[in-house]
Amino acid sequence: MKKQLQKLLTCLLSGILLLSLLVTTPANQLAVKAAPAVNSPYKKACWISFLDIEELLQDKTEKTFRATVSAMYDNVLHYGMNTVIVHVRAMGDAMYPSDYFPWSEYLTSDRSNPGYDPLQIMIELAHAKNLQFEAWLNPYRLSRDNKSTVSFKTTPYYAQFLPYTIEYTAPGGQTCLALDPARTETKDLIVKGIREIVSRYDVDGIHFDDYFYVSGMADQLDIVSRKNNVNALVSQVYSTIKSIKPGCTFGISPAGNPDNARSQGADIDTWLSTPGYIDYIMPQIYWTDVYMTANGAVPMFSNRCSAWTALNKQQLPMYAGLALYRVGTNSKTDLGWAASDTNLAYQYVTAKQLGYDGYALFRYQWLEKEIAAAELNHLKNY
């Protein structure tokens, strides 16, 4: 009987929390709306992933490429954003003519030269529309599944990279490739590629996400060694960028769970307490505040935001990575996505109250999906 009462009480409390979050709109929390995005001191960004590029821009003529990118940027602006974070290297490849990496198969399906410079066009169009442009790179990843592994092995770069490449089995059984973070050759190659971008293109920033030591890649390696290897790269990337273009920012978007980020080699404690590593942090806080646990609902988004704020000893700019792709989804654990269409606005307001300086939405394609329209319209008012 006692256990039944405890269970009933837990359910009642969870229901009350859910109801309170549903009726508490961002307007209740923030009386003054933000200035237009292009003039806002807050970063309001959209990630444009290699998946977006493949779906919308692959194998296009220059004219069609320009028109499509321009329309994409107009959509970003329509929803009140001022920054695009665009994949320029997703898997040991390049969305531009590179001296060090092959053309991306997500840009041209046969990895051929498209006959124009896609990166230059994307930057020019962004700046013409007053959008900041950050070049997004995955430093180590060369492939993500069997198909992309076979594809990369057909390039002449595979033989070149082979001495410092790890071939591993990812969860699910897929064979993947990655540059070995422990090797000096890996670090040198990545830094050369970043030097190439920053010296040739007018990018406003360089951006890494959370793909460092992914599951299966080097599971036998301890966390301290992982962090040391990644730190050696991150510090050199930072100093290289600043030596070429001091105003170009370098930021990282780690996994939203700090412990998971650390396990992947992201030394977030050092980055957020010691100068010389990053200019900003953008944790991927992909939960709502109605997240179910064995003990009932918890405000997971707010809890994660607070945890990252506590780590930020340098008081660096912080931006919240938000899960646009989850809006409207039915989840057995994260109930907020299906229960409300003000999650993103609520999350942005909450993050600002905790000291964050903006957000980024993952990813572009959901700007065009009807299921996300209500969420986006609420968000753009803030």
Predicted regions and their residues:
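Sec-dependent signal peptide cleavage junction
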Residues: 21-37
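Active-site-adjacent "subsite" loops/lids of carbohydrate-active enzymes
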Residues: 38-67, 124, 134-135, 140-196, ...
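Aromatic- and glycine-enriched glycan-recognition loops and surfaces
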Residues: 60-79, 106-129, 229-233
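Catalytic domains of carbohydrate-active enzymes, especially glycoside hydrolases
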Residues: 67-94, 200-205, 276-281, 351-359
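Aromatic-lined carbohydrate-binding/catalytic grooves of carbohydrate-active enzymes
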Residues: 81-114
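Aromatic- and acidic-residue-enriched segments that line the glycan-binding/catalytic groove
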Residues: 96-109, 141-173, 211-224, 335-336
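Aromatic-lined carbohydrate-recognition surfaces of secreted/lumenal glycan-active proteins
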Residues: 132-144, 207-211, 226-265, 316-325
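Substrate-binding cleft of secreted/luminal carbohydrate-active enzymes
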Residues: 275-302, 307-382
